[in-house]
Swiss-Prot record:
Residues 212-233 are annotated as: Disordered. PROSITE patterns: HOMEOBOX_1, HOMEOBOX_2. PANTHER family: GNOT1 HOMEODOMAIN PROTEIN-RELATED, HOMEOBOX PROTEIN EMX-RELATED. GO terms for cellular component: nucleus. Pfam families: Homeodomain. Transcriptional repressor. Plays a fundamental role in notochord formation, acting within the mesodermal region. Acts downstream of gsc and upstream of chrd and foxa4-A/pintallavis. It is found in: Nucleus. Localized to the dorsal lip of the blastopore (Spemann organizer) during early gastrulation, after which expression continues in tissues derived from the organizer. Expressed in the notochord during mid-gastrulation, the chordoneural hinge, notochord and ventral spinal cord of the tailbud at stage 22, and finally the tip of the tail in the tadpole (stage 35). One of its GO terms (biological process) is neuron differentiation. GO terms for molecular function: DNA-binding transcription factor activity, RNA polymerase II-specific; RNA polymerase II cis-regulatory region sequence-specific DNA binding. Keywords: Developmental protein, DNA-binding, Homeobox, Nucleus, Repressor, Transcription, Transcription regulation. InterPro entries: EMX-VAX-Noto_Homeobox_TFs, HD, HD_metazoa, Homeobox_CS, Homeodomain-like_sf, HTH_motif. It comes from Xenopus laevis. This is Homeobox protein not2.
Amino acid sequence: MLHSPVFPAFGHHLADYPAMPLATDLPRTPKSSFNIDSILSRTDRPASKVSMEMPSWQPPSPPFHYSYGMVPYPPMWLIKPTVGYPNMAQAQPMRMPRGECLCPDPACKHRGLSYSHCPNGALNPLSWRTGPCKLKRIRTVFTPEQLERLEKEFLKQQYMVGTERVDLASTLNLTETQVKVWFQNRRIKWRKQSLEQKKAKLSQFGVILADSSDHTDDSRETEEEEDDVDVEL
């Protein structure tokens, strides 16, 4: 026991307490090894973090020379819950059925088809704004018996209207519009043939026949009418 001359009891108290351990006696934390085997065998690796970022998406690019206000509406984008995270939403494209062709013309063959399969809607990006579908120009194939009867009626009269045209169409099992278009085309052909024959006769005498303004206007008016009434069959 140690005794202090100044504090006699100091040595007594020092003797009652156990000796403090040295720094060398403290437990040491094992050093971490950074070799491959040690890293692979670790069980305290942090779990991989799941990316919580929302996926970015962009609507489809418009065709060249068209803006988003001019092209048809893109597929609808719906918000669907992400698997495993019901509270988080992810934007995913989902194609909705398109509307049918709204062409009001009863002769349109595309009525009832999906507008995405309509030839006019697929080729023209503005067709859904520009009104009814424009019908293709397809000529009617007449039978020899029908042509013979039509030519016979044309020799009688170049214009057929009213009940006569309706009766002729019913007799030949044709529509009234088909008969009307045939007579219009036949009149144009007859005018061209007559003009060529007239020019051929006058050319024998060295005379060149100029086209008259009345004939040109008449032909132009007939051709424009033909464009308006020609139908798809």
